[in-house]
């Protein structure tokens, strides 16, 4: 759902910040 999509987007954003 929408909430899951937002969670995935945030997770990817954090992952990119931690491991560019």
From Swiss-Prot:
Domain of life: Eukaryota
Gene Ontology cellular component list: extracellular region
Keyword Membrane: no
Primary localization class, coarse: secreted
Tissues and organs where the protein is expressed, per its UniProt entry: Expressed by the skin dorsal glands.
Localization per Swiss-Prot or TrEMBL: Secreted
A GO BP annotation: negative regulation of nitric-oxide synthase activity
One function term, GO molecular function aspect: nitric-oxide synthase regulator activity
S-S pairs: none
Key words of the record: Amphibian defense peptide, Secreted
Its job: Has no antimicrobial activity. Strongly inhibits the formation of NO by neuronal nitric oxide synthase at micromolar concentrations. Acts by a non-competitive mechanism, probably by binding to calcium/calmodulin and as a consequence blocking calmodulin attachment to nNOS.
Name assigned to this protein: Dahlein-5.1
Organism: Ranoidea dahlii
Source taxonomy: Eukaryota, Metazoa, Chordata, Craniata, Vertebrata
